[in-house]
Amino acid sequence: MDYFTLFGLPARYQIDTQALSLRFQDLQRQYHPDKFANGTQAQQLAAVQQSATINQAWQTLRHPLTRAEYLLSLHGFDLASEQHTVRDTAFLMEQLTLREELDDIEQSKDDVRLESFIKHVQKMFDARLQQMVEQLDNAAWDAAADTVRKLRFLDKLRSSAEQLEEKLLDF
């Protein structure tokens, strides 16, 4: 059973996150291993396995990027374990330039410039995310997979910038 079906949701990117949360809580209560403490060893093991599946499904579907990756996996794109990388040289060059800029910001410890950088990267991420949503809505799986790969780059860059921000604030 796929994760969307487990939570009673349609297999699409845009989901009702409130319904996801409520169903997660219901499933947690229903399959919590403590409820099977007096059951047979097989029942206890099944409850632990079901609980682990529910938790994994929840973690996957609640985050936009992992939800997109999972949806794409249902359509034959295994992005989680693939060796395929972004082939868009302009995008890759832009990423190198942004990484260099982040390094410069770190060297200069310029928190004002860092704040502007983070906002810029967030705008780039949001624009790509919107592009991906449209691609998934239109079942443009190849294009959506490529956009997810690019979003991974931007997500890592954003994370690096936020870590630098914490480092500069602690300094």
Curated annotation (Swiss-Prot):
Organism of origin = Salmonella paratyphi B (strain ATCC BAA-1250 / SPB7)
Q: Which PROSITE patterns match?
A: DNAJ_2
What cellular component terms from Gene Ontology apply here? Answer: iron-sulfur cluster transfer complex
- What is the documented function of this protein? Co-chaperone involved in the maturation of iron-sulfur cluster-containing proteins. Seems to help targeting proteins to be folded toward HscA.
Keywords, alphabetical: Chaperone
Record's superkingdom? Bacteria
CDD domains on file: DnaJ
Transmembrane segments annotated in the record for this chain: none
- Record has Ribosomal protein as a keyword: no
Which InterPro entries does this chain map to?
DnaJ_domain, HscB, HscB_C_sf, HscB_oligo_C, J_dom_sf
Lineage of the native species? Answer: Bacteria, Pseudomonadati, Pseudomonadota, Gammaproteobacteria, Enterobacterales
Q: Which family does it belong to?
A: Belongs to the HscB family.
A Pfam short name: HSCB_C
NCBIfam families, per the entry: hscB (TIGR00714), PRK05014.1 (NF003449)
- GO MF entries: ATPase activator activity; protein-folding chaperone binding
Please state what the protein is called: Co-chaperone protein HscB
Subunit relationships: Interacts with HscA and stimulates its ATPase activity. Interacts with IscU.
Q: Which residues form the J domain?
A: 2-74
**Which GO BP terms, alphabetically?**
[2Fe-2S] cluster assembly; protein complex oligomerization; protein folding
UniProt keyword Zinc present: no
